[in-house]
């Protein structure tokens, strides 16, 4: 049977990345409270393609994922990338897992439990035997405007915001570490299940800790700078303003070295 993929390309130009996107599969991730958590991932996976090949072998990406049944961590991702690189005879391999991660949070007053969903991404790349990984998580929080509180006789405007954290790490860290870090940087965490006593607590607690997006991003960045396993981070806070027809945002990006580590 003719192998069209290996025939000469009409335009001899190398391709940086080619593969498959939005492939869904079950996934097991590490869970600080339960040990393991079963979720569903949407996966992008690809390799580079030399200029002389017309096309890649798309089925081999799916085969690699079908044969990969491990719990998601850096070591298992590296093995997957090595397998893809070998199957496709490529110099570079890439994989991105997007998945929801759930934490059962207790309401602050009544202790009523409710699952909160956090959107996560883990990207892995392998080139010349050297892997690199990028972990991203989105954390919803509540913010109360300090200016509105200061100038108003009654109340202040409040809204939901999202803290987006991206980190490169030297060693494994729990997702919960970054979720906790983001939640304490806002005016208040948000919850799925709140009774009246809980709503009272959350409202009063948030109004006691008013924050601009600038405050939230600085607080989160300061905590990330102190994290011993982080070599680089980016944090962005986006506030879905309740009294404006636009959103507010702030972002900070830093590379952490022994010289820039706080306390060094």
Swiss-Prot record:
<feature type="site" description="May be catalytically important">
    <location>
        <position position="145"/>
    </location>
</feature>
<dbReference type="InterPro" id="IPR022838">
    <property type="entry name" value="GTP_cyclohydrolase_FolE2"/>
</dbReference>
<dbReference type="Pfam" id="PF02649">
    <property type="entry name" value="GCHY-1"/>
</dbReference>
<dbReference type="GO" id="GO:0003934">
    <property type="term" value="F:GTP cyclohydrolase I activity"/>
</dbReference>
<dbReference type="GO" id="GO:0046654">
    <property type="term" value="P:tetrahydrofolate biosynthetic process"/>
</dbReference>
<dbReference type="InterPro" id="IPR003801">
    <property type="entry name" value="GTP_cyclohydrolase_FolE2/MptA"/>
</dbReference>
<comment type="function">
    <text>Converts GTP to 7,8-dihydroneopterin triphosphate.</text>
</comment>
<comment type="pathway">
    <text>Cofactor biosynthesis; 7,8-dihydroneopterin triphosphate biosynthesis; 7,8-dihydroneopterin triphosphate from GTP: step 1/1.</text>
</comment>
<comment type="similarity">
    <text>Belongs to the GTP cyclohydrolase IV family.</text>
</comment>
<keyword id="KW-0378">Hydrolase</keyword>
<protein>
    <recommendedName>
        <fullName>GTP cyclohydrolase FolE2</fullName>
        <ecNumber>3.5.4.16</ecNumber>
    </recommendedName>
</protein>
């Amino acid at each position: 049977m003719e192998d069209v993929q290996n025939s000469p390309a009409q335009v001899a130009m190398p391709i940086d990345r080619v593969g498959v996107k939005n492939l869904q599969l079950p996934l097991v991730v590490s869970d600080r409270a339960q040990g393991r958590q079963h979720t569903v991932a949407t996966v992008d996976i690809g390799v580079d393609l030399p200029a002389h090949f017309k096309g890649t072998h798309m089925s081999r990406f799916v085969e690699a994922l079908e044969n990969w049944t491990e719990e998601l961590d850096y070591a298992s991702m590296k093995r997957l990338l090595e397998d893809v690189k070998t199957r496709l005879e490529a110099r570079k391999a890439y994989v991105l897992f997007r998945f929801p991660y759930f934490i059962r949070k207790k309401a602050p007053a009544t202790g009523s439990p409710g699952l909160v969903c956090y959107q996560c991404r883990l990207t892995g790349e392998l080139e010349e035997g050297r892997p690199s990984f990028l972990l991203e998580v989105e954390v919803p929080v509540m913010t109360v405007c300090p200016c509105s509180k200061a100038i108003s006789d009654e109340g202040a405007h409040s809204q939901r915001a999202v803290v987006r954290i991206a980190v490169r790490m030297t060693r494994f860290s729990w997702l919960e570490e970054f979720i906790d870090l983001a939640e304490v940087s806002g005016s208040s965490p948000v919850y799925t299940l709140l009774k009246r006593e809980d709503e009272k607590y959350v409202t009063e607690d948030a109004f006691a800790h008013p924050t601009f997006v600038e405050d939230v991003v600085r607080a989160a960045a300061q905590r990330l700078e102190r994290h011993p396993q982080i070599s680089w981070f980016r944090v962005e806070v986006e506030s879905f303003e309740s009294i404006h027809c636009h959103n507010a945002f702030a972002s900070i990006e830093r590379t952490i070295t022994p010289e820039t580590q706080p306390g060094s």
